[in-house]
Swiss-Prot record:
Organism the protein comes from: Botryotinia fuckeliana (strain B05.10) (Noble rot fungus)
Protein name: AA9 family lytic polysaccharide monooxygenase I
Compartment annotation: Secreted
Protein's gene: AA9I
Major location (coarse): secreted
Swiss-Prot/TrEMBL induction comment: Expression is not induced in cellulose-inducible conditions (in Avicel- and wheat bran-containing complex medium).
Amino acid sequence: MFSKKITALALVSAVKAHGTVSGIVADGIYYDGYNPSYQYTSPAPVTVGWLIPKDLDNGFISPAAYTTSDIICHVDAAPAQIEAPVKAGGKVELQWTPWPVSHKGPVIDYLANCNGPCETVDKTKLQWFKIDQVGLISPTAETSGLWGTDVLIANNNSWTVTIPSDIATGNYVLRHEIIALHSASSVNGAQNYPQCVNLAIKGTGTAKPAGVSATSFYTPTDPGIQFSLYGTLTSYTIPGPALYSGAISVTQTLPAAPTASATGVYTVS
């Protein structure tokens, strides 16, 4: 039974796979991301990435589901049971499975304070503030333009985000997302790939930015959601709330080798 389940999973993934975060590097320490195949192992690995066992095809959330809880951290996502420690002002690298070149679009990052343990947080109560966004970089650099996803691919399918240095110590969820626009010219054609990671952030800051619910981020007809990737491009409006004033931009470069690996930590006090 075990081998049959794994074989079925492999076949589905081969046909429909797009991408998922397979690894996280927080302040130079590597952590495994979640893989849906873990549900077929005993004991299942404990990861800092949120659990998405129903995402068997590494699939997406469509605009039709923007008002449902699936847009928060992916389909039927459940909180990770450990957290990766990172300093305020530190860097978190998200390592994706190989991303398709044709799936161009923005890369966006949000944070939400769990106001307690993230392991037991009600995801529908999380209030998110945007800390990073890269959309259309150059409309004429290549066919369909140069996008955040192209930079991600060029950086070994990885993306680095800096944690704002002014935020208060606490337990947070990092929501990292790619929005693929290759079919977005029609309503419900955009493809959202949200991935969530538990972080234990420590610093000297006191800021507690206001946020919004993920179910209010986007609508199916937002100009950055229903968008034609093909033809003459002039501009692109990145969807979602405004960027947090304390956000720190990152110049994406080829990632450095992790200094160590770990399985995660439990909640910081």
